[in-house]
């Protein structure tokens, strides 16, 4: 098995000399196709061993590189079939990967490393060949163009494209593991694109020579790699990461990458660095607009316009499901982070204080209701069967009066009483005590249990030089709803409800940009009052009071997929009921929807 350290060491050394094919290996194309067809009949481990052996022998075989690429394509198809089976063991996991799943991840990444190692030799040899041809005297320019130079250029373009494709798949695996890609991966990616620009292969349509499924040119593939990084997918649920990766082809067609910026964009890539796409700030190491830096600039406005148009079309068609929520989240995230970044309050050390956040709609509702279940809050015993809640908000723990510790996180806030901005920053404190955020009788907070948002569940030693760690998916994700509970001594709680707009994943204290939705909260139950065929069972809801400083109106936050604009709903607390109308939708994510409401 090849791990990252072996892979990096191989790329850092000179390409090994080509060796004669072993007698046991047949380089005939038809023979290899027959081998690939029979490969799935074997056990998975045997398939992996055979693929590793064939890839190694093809890499060092003394054959023409055009023939090598043809044979590589056959092996690549066989490897992709096996990889698809291996990935089924972990891509739908909702929690941290266990050791069993990490073993499959390691096997998949090993195959990708081996493929890159094979293509790397082709790239180096073709670059040397093109340089030699360039230095030779020009005797017959047309003949040279249609023979050596042209075929070498196509071979180089195909090898570069396939290498970038393998790097894309590696980055996809890192994202599913919630692991930060190593700097060397992005250095290699940037260098490949830079080389393709220099060799003028970046816009060659390789679909005329090999099957392509995700892009036709090196430039299009690089655009997908950049977009995947800009979307900060590690701050999403794993299911959404998979959906983003499937939609990259469509989305990247609206991404514009140029050497000369077309607008005042601040998103760029330094092609001579190991950095992923970066947003220009005062802390950047370089000024990308200086001519002596080799940078490309990324324009996102056209992509956001496409996402918004697609989202609006789904609304018209009444298809406001998973794709709609993802489109909405991505469009809002790109606008917030890169196009029209909102000014968050400067971090004031004098105003720093520790607080706690509760995530998960049901846990938030349970806390705001003073730890009452939904049935208790709305006196469900007095309701007919067709209005009874179908589920409870109380945590499923040994003790019913405990809030789920897995949704409680300790944070640092940087606010003061006169803060007017609705966009703020907090720091997540890892490996911290997660106390009961409800005040005890003496007004003090009481600790409950330890919690770490980034905990190592399992470690698999796939090689003595490489260790894979299992990372818990973040509970505070982009567009996550949360309740911020500040320390308080009075009877009334000091809290705010907000939504995550951006999360930095790699700091010691992960930084979270969030939007305040309100401070005055009431927990209640809501049911549909319309006379149609939809369910009329009560569901949990939160009334958010309007705020003059935040310039917000009274609104209702409910779990997504229950209601729509124009609905007449019944709000209930104890036995008291009020009729409301949902006037306008203010926000919708896969977790919650927020509506402006009026009382009827």
What does each model-found stretch correspond to?
Residues 75-105, 326, 330-335, 498-502, ...:
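A broad "ordered helical/assembly scaffold" signature
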Residues 3, 26, 62, 73, ...:
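Detector for Asparagine
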Residues 108, 114-116, 122-123, 134, ...:
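Generic hydrophobic, helix-prone segments enriched in Leu/Val/Ile
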Residues 2-226:
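Long, leucine/valine-rich, helix-dominated scaffolding and oligomerization segments
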Residues 195-395:
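Extended, domain-scale alpha-helical bundle/helix-rich regions
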Residues 329, 338-491, 497-523, 527-600:
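Short strand-loop-strand
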């Amino acid at each position: 098995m090849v791990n990252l350290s072996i892979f990096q060491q191989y790329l850092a050394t000179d390409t090994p000399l080509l060796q004669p094919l072993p007698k046991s290996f047949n380089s005939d194309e038809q023979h290899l196709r027959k081998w690939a067809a029979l490969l799935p009949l074997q056990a998975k481990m045997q398939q992996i061993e055979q693929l590793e052996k064939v890839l190694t022998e093809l890499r060092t075989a003394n054959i023409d590189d055009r023939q090598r690429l043809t044979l590589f394509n056959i092996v690549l198809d066989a490897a992709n079939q096996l990889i698809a089976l291996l990935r089924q063991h972990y891509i739908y996991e909702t929690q941290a990967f266990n050791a069993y799943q990490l073993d499959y991840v390691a096997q998949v990444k090993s195959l990708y490393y081996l493929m890159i190692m094979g293509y790397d030799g082709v790239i180096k040899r073709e670059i040397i060949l093109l340089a030699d041809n360039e230095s030779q005297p020009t005797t017959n320019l047309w003949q040279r163009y249609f023979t050596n130079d042209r075929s070498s250029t196509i071979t180089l373009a195909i090898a570069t494209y396939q290498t970038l494709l393998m790097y894309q798949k590696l980055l996809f695996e890192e994202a599913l593991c919630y692991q930060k890609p190593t700097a060397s991966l992005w250095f290699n990616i940037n260098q490949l694109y830079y080389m393709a620009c220099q060799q003028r292969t970046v816009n060659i349509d390789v679909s005329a020579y090999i099957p392509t499924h995700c892009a036709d040119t090196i430039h299009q593939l690089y655009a997908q790699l950049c977009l995947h990084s800009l979307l900060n997918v590690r701050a999403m649920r794993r299911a959404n990461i998979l959906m983003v990766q499937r939609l990259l082809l469509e989305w990247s067609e609206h991404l514009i990458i140029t050497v000369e910026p077309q607008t005042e964009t601040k998103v760029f890539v330094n092609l001579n660095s190991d950095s992923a796409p970066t947003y220009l700030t005062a802390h950047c190491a370089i000024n990308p607009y200086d001519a002596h830096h080799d940078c490309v600039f990324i324009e996102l406005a056209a992509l956001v316009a496409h996402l918004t148009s697609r989202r609006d079309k789904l609304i018209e068609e009444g298809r406001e499901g998973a794709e709609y929520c993802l489109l909405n989240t991505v469009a809002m995230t790109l606008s917030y982070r890169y196009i029209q970044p909102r000014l968050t309050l400067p971090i004031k050390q004098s105003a720093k204080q520790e607080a706690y956040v509760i995530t998960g709609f049901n846990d938030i509702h349970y806390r705001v209701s003073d730890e009452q279940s939904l049935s208790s809050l709305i006196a469900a015993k007095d309701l007919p069967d067709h209005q009874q809640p179908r589920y409870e908000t109380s945590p499923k723990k040994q003790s019913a009066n405990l809030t789920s510790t897995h949704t409680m996180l300790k944070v640092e806030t940087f606010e003061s009483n006169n803060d007017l901005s609705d966009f703020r920053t907090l720091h997540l404190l890892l490996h911290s005590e997660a106390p009961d955020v409800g005040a005890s009788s003496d007004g003090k907070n009481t600790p409950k249990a330890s919690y770490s948002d980034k905990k190592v569940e399992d470690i698999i030693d796939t090689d003595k030089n490489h260790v894979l760690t299992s990372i818990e998916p973040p509970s505070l994700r982009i567009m996550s709803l949360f309740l911020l509970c500040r320390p308080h001594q009075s009877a009334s709680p000091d809290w705010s409800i907000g939504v995550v707009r951006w999360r930095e994943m790699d700091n010691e204290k992960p930084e979270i940009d969030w939007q305040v939705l309100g401070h005055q909260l009431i927990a209640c139950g809501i049911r549909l009052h319309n006379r149609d065929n939809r369910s009329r069972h009560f569901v949990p809801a939160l009334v958010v009071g309007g705020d003059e400083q935040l310039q917000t109106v009274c609104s209702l936050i409910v779990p997504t997929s229950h209601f729509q604009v124009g609905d007449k709903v019944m709000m209930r607390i104890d036995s008291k009921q009020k009729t409301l109308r949902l006037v306008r939708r203010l926000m919708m994510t896969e977790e919650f929807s927020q509506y402006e409401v009026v009382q009827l």
